[in-house]
């Protein structure tokens, strides 16, 4: 009997250690993704100084919020005087709900890998210097409520994949260089037209007919 109890205790201890190691590996994976972002950014005000890759758990870093399972759920770096570009590794933060990088001077494109963030609720990249298209992959973000990309230099059409996100409540793509027509179906039926203003090549709403450059919108 004592031998059986000992084996059970040994099994329980081994299971606990295994689960702890799994959480450790997951935390390190998320830390690697965040550190890739740090390396891709210029940070003159040292707001990312606590993002130390030698620390096991990124939940101890400033501007990072985690849930009770020590999984990263928020990155809050709005108005932080950051420049550089967005790292595609951000797409590995599978529990991320809020990505707040507004009012910086971030350049380059929006990584298509952000479409892997299946739990994302808010994507705030407004008031930066982003270029390129709005990735079609963002249409996979079925939990997304807030999408604010205004005041950048984005080009191309508004992806129709975004109209299939039932949770989407706020879309703002004003003050870019988007082209084509403004969607009106799905959640876009309730988005005010002012959220599309200051895109000289954007026509809409699309129910008024296709713009002459709809088939050649880049």
Curated annotation (Swiss-Prot):
Presence of the UniProt keyword Transferase in the record: no
Keywords attached to this entry: Leucine-rich repeat, Plant defense, Repeat, Signal
Domain of life: Eukaryota
GO terms under biological process: defense response; signal transduction
Gene3D superfamilies: Ribonuclease Inhibitor
KW Signal (keyword) present: yes
Inducing factors: Up-regulated by methyl jasmonate.
Renumbered ranges of LRR repeats: 94-117, 119-140, 141-165, 167-190
Signal peptide: 1-27
UniProt xrefs under InterPro entries: LRR_dom_sf, LRR_N_plant-typ, LRR_R13L4/SHOC2-like
Role played: Involved in plant defense response.
UniProt subunit comment: Interacts with HIR1.
Protein name (database record): Leucine-rich repeat protein 1
Origin species: Arabidopsis thaliana (Mouse-ear cress)
